[in-house]
A protein has these predicted regions:
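N-terminal "domain-start" segment that seeds a small globular fold
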Residues: 20-44
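Bacterial N-terminal signal peptides
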Residues: 6-16
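Conserved beta-strand segments of alpha/beta enzyme cores
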Residues: 82, 106-107
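Short active-site neighborhood of thiol/selenol oxidoreductases, capturing the structured segment around
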Residues: 43-64
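Positively charged n-region of N-terminal signal peptides that target proteins for export
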Residues: 1-5
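Thiol/disulfide oxidoreductase modules built on the thioredoxin-like
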Residues: 100-103, 113-155
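Structural microenvironment flanking redox-active thiols in thiol-disulfide oxidoreductases
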Residues: 64-101, 113-116
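Structural beta-sheet core signal
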Residues: 54, 83-85, 130
Length: 160
């Protein structure tokens, strides 16, 4: 009985500790290289001071809920922030549903075999990473927690 209780406790600990692990991003450090297989309709977002990459799946209700808010922030800070919606889905499956999100500041990228998800250590979606022009991470977390106040703080931060 003690052995069973020990095993159940160990499994419960592993499950909770795994879900609490941080992603593979260290603020102030370079973000990993993105392995983009292709861009939806070959459209990449215009250059901006900051890039927000959202790790996304078109069937995820959480992703669908967060995307309009992030797009609104991108539009509010015109020219300061662009958005890359990154998915591991096939072009044929996700392309149709994601086409509506394309704009000068928003692009949809298809990950090459999940390599970018792996490089970033993504353990949940929608996960966001914001990095500057030089590729240094300035913010990361759940897409739901990214808002205008957060981006205002990013804009006031001066890199030395």
């Amino acid at each position: 009985m003690k052995l069973l209780l020990t095993i159940v406790s160990a499994i419960a600990f592993m499950l909770t500790s795994t879900s609490a692990e941080a992603q593979n991003i260290i603020l102030g450090e370079k973000v990993p290289d993105s392995r983009i297989r292709s861009w939806l309709m070959d459209l990449q977002p215009d250059a901006a001071d900051y890039t927000c990459i959202i790790f996304y799946h078109s069937k995820s209700p959480r992703c669908q809920e967060c995307l309009p808010k992030i797009k609104r922030i991108v539009n509010t800070y015109e020219g300061k922030l662009n958005l890359i919606i990154l998915t591991k889905e096939d072009y044929s499956k996700a392309g149709v549903t994601l086409t509506e999100h394309l704009s000068d500041r928003v692009g949809v990228a298809f990950d090459d075999g999940g390599r970018t998800f792996i490089a970033y250590g993504v353990r949940f979606i929608p996960f966001c990473v914001i990095y500057d022009k030089k590729g240094y991470a300035v913010w990361c977390g759940h897409a739901k927690s990214f808002d205008e106040k957060t981006f205002d703080r990013i804009l006031t931060y001066k890199r030395k």
